[in-house]
Swiss-Prot record:
Region (Disordered): 250-270
Composition-biased stretches (Pro residues): 251-261
MF terms in GO: ATP binding; ATP hydrolysis activity
E.C. number: 7.6.2.14
Gene designation per UniProt: ssuB
One GO cellular component term noted in the UniProt record for this chain: plasma membrane
Listed name of the protein: Aliphatic sulfonates import ATP-binding protein SsuB
Sequence positions that bind ATP: 49-56
Record-linked Gene3D superfamilies: P-loop containing nucleotide triphosphate hydrolases
Family named by the database record: Belongs to the ABC transporter superfamily. Aliphatic sulfonates importer (TC 3.A.1.17.2) family.
Reaction catalyzed: ATP + H2O + aliphatic sulfonate-[sulfonate-binding protein]Side 1 = ADP + phosphate + aliphatic sulfonateSide 2 + [sulfonate-binding protein]Side 1
């Protein structure tokens, strides 16, 4: 398997992120309440929490799919909005166009001689031989690999992952986790992964952030060597620490997070 060709150093560096007093309200409901985050360039961060806690709203704000009610988002010293061209977002649904072949889905929106780059991206995710097939012929995991290739072709500096592995079976999910981790280590982009799976979070991330009732409840550094040994005592201890914090929060589960209409400048992994 080959890897994507060397790119200029600017494109290999992740984007440093900062959220300062970030707030988002929907009517009378405050979904995010003064979130403060500082994420170094190239860090792999997992965001976990109960359904409705605000984690998906946070990712939508980072992706530019929604606007904050207060506070600011920065990429280094500049507004995060200035880094949109270097940002890609993956969803649980691969969102492939069924009337376009795999390689055309990867090169969606590109012009010029993009096909060699698309083949390189597909090769990086192990699907070069499926380039000229239709999406309907692929499994769920393979479709997500295509979505990942569609992001990689743009050499993102920030990759936002909104439960991209949630619908996959256990073995395929682990394979995708390993693939994303390998590509992250290779290219050095910043990653934010929203997941309900605490074991997934501690297995792949440098840092696990727990969102509780719209605020940061726990910010845990996962200081373990890579590749990590699944089922190890140290990994299990970290998973238990996060789970115990989640389960210790009193009260009934919150309502589902509101979803604002998608803006016209939406950028998926394409």
């Amino acid at each position: 398997m080959t890897v994507l060709k060397e790119q200029p150093p600017r494109l290999l560096r992740g984007i440093p992120l900062a959220a300062n007093d970030l707030r988002r309200t929907f009517g009378q409901r405050e979904v995010l309440r003064g979130v403060d985050l500082h994420i170094p360039a190239g860090q792999f961060v997992a965001i976990v929490g109960r359904s409705g806690c605000g984690k998906s709203t946070l990712l939508r704000l980072l992706a530019g799919l929604d606007q904050p009610s207060g506070g600011e988002l920065l990429a280094g010293a500049a507004p995060l909005a200035e880094a949109r061209e270097d940002t890609r977002l993956m969803f649980q649904d691969a969102r492939l166009l069924p009337w376009k072949k795999v390689i055309d889905n990867v090169g969606l929106g590109l012009s010029g001689n993009w096909r060699p780059r698309a083949l390189e991206a597909l090769d990086a995710v192990g699907l070069a031989e499926r380039a000229h097939e239709w999406p309907a012929a692929l499994s769920g995991g393979q479709k997500q690999r295509v979505a990942l290739a569609r992001a990689l072709i743009h050499q993102p500096r920030l990759l936002l992952l909104d439960e991209p592995l949630g619908a996959l079976d256990a073995l395929t999910r682990i394979e995708m986790q390993q693939l994303i981790e390998r590509l992250w280590r290779q290219h050095g982009f910043t990653v934010l992964l929203v997941t309900h799976d605490v074991s997934e979070a501690v297995a792949v991330a440098d840092r696990v952030i727990l969102i509780e009732d719209g605020a940061v409840g726990l910010d845990l550094v996962v200081d373990l060597p890579r590749p990590r040994v699944r089922g190890s005592h140290r990994l299990a201890a970290l998973e238990s620490e996060v789970l115990n914090r989640v389960l210790s929060v009193p009260g009934t589960p919150p309502e589902p997070e509101p979803v604002a209409p998608l803006p016209t400048h939406l950028r998926w992994a394409h």
